[in-house]
Design a protein with these regions (language model features):
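Structural signal for interior beta-strand "rungs" in well-ordered beta-sheet cores
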Residues: 1-56, 60-61
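Terminal amphipathic alpha-helical/low-complexity segments used for targeting or macromolecular assembly
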Residues: 58-129
Length: 129
């Protein structure tokens, strides 16, 4: 995990492996940050950030998957594409997030990455960005 200068964590924050937290980021207490995710500099994380994504903006929002980080860690192009499709369904489709999660659970190939995404979202207590 990489934390740039002035990044601040509240109490009981959970951070997955290979996370990149930009400079000046403030993470609220009890927030969970999923593995391989990246938070753009200068923003505030008040809700949980699922694995494998890039988030930025005020309020913090999904920007895309952490493609470069996943490539560097050796994820296959098939795994990256599946992650991208799952998050496109969850964040970008016109469905509400409950419906989108059900589609991911029922219609997507259940790889290790998809299972981590599903488990992370279902176990979120603070909501998802």
């Amino acid at each position: 995990t990489i934390m740039a200068n002035l990044a601040t964590l509240g109490g009981h924050v959970e951070i997955g492996e290979w996370v990149n937290i930009g400079g000046g980021v403030v993470v609220h207490q009890f927030v969970k940050i999923g593995e391989q995710s990246l938070i753009g500099g200068g923003f505030c994380a008040k809700q949980d950030i699922p694995p494998y994504i890039i988030v930025a903006g005020h309020p913090l929002r999904f920007i895309g998957i952490n493609k470069i980080g996943l490539e560097r860690r050796g994820y296959s192009s098939e795994a990256r594409l599946l992650i991208k499709k799952a998050y496109r369904e969850y964040f970008i489709s016109k469905k509400n997030r409950g419906q989108a999660l059900a589609i991911i659970k029922n219609n997507f190939k259940h790889s290790e990455e998809i299972e981590k995404i599903i488990n992370f979202i279902e176990s979120s207590n603070r909501g998802i960005v």
